[in-house]
Amino acid sequence: MLLYRSAAWFAKGLREYTKSGYESASKDFVPDDLEVQVPGRAFMVTGGNSGIGKATAMEIAKRGGTVHLVCRDHSRAEGAKAEIIRESGNQNIFLHIVDLSLPKSVWKFVENFKQEHTLNVLINNAGCMVNKRELTEDGLEKNFATNTLGVYVLTTALIPVLEKEHDPRVITVSSGGMLVQKLNTDDPQSERTAFDGTMVYAQNKRQQVVLTERWARAHPAIHFSCMHPGWVDTPGVRLSMPGFHARLGARLRSEAQGADTVLWLALAPAATAQPSGCFFQDRKPAPTHLPLARTSSSPAEEEKLIEILEELARRFK
């Protein structure tokens, strides 16, 4: 079944996830959707020092938004902050150094953040794909700790902050790779199965889709969404998937093309006309399962994921 899912996904990707797929989809975009200015609104972008995150932060800054960059690497983050200020002319760019794979650090960060700042939009962009099983200092598998638990803790902690503001939104940068994975709650940290970093990443992205749907039902005052940016030429892809990067080459999307739907979901009034909790691709809701792929999960399986995350979030608070 995994072989079928992977083949179907790759064929779909060649049609839709490439640069040519973006160019085709963009013919249906409403050009004025992103002709907005957002002074007075505050945006948090995790992983904002490179790739899609930096492209997103740059465009928000150019439109007058206050941007909070949440990054792990201080030196690279300082460089990104300086570049964004220089190119946008916007001084309201703040830098926060946080390792999202360490939930205690995330809880502490939010506790301090909410004492000084407001927030309208959270963009969960940061992620990692570690190809050999690696544990954090808390003993958690690093991909899961960053991509799933980190997103869960940060979003959960910030929901009360977001609910106080006008037009609050949460956008999570997922991946079309999640289409090859059924939600797995029996071994979420890959302790009992052969480790494949690409499949672990895809599983994390499936978990993000489930979380988005759950949050949307639980918190109707906030517009939640997740999205697939397409196959994008980013530093992360070059580092973690060198073979894939070499194979696709010039067919990969630019960082700006990858960031387009993130920006649309974060900025456009039209985005909140769509139901909360959806998965988006190129500014449109997209299916979360491939035909005949048997990747649907039961409510009990989804509840088990929440229970696992809640227990870990409490343990490391």
Curated annotation (Swiss-Prot):
EC number(s) on file: 1.1.-.-
An annotated Gene Ontology molecular function: oxidoreductase activity
InterPro entries reported for this sequence: NAD(P)-bd_dom_sf, SDR_fam, SDR_member_12
Positions of NAD(+) binding: 50, 52, 201, 205, 234
Residues the record marks as active site: 201
Coiled-coil region(s): none
Main EC class the enzyme belongs to: oxidoreductase
Listed Pfam families: adh_short
CDD domains membership: DHRS-12_like_SDR_c-like
Sorted UniProt keywords: NAD, NADP, Oxidoreductase
Binding site for substrate: 175
Similarity remark: Belongs to the short-chain dehydrogenases/reductases (SDR) family.
Function: Putative oxidoreductase.
Protein name: Dehydrogenase/reductase SDR family member 12
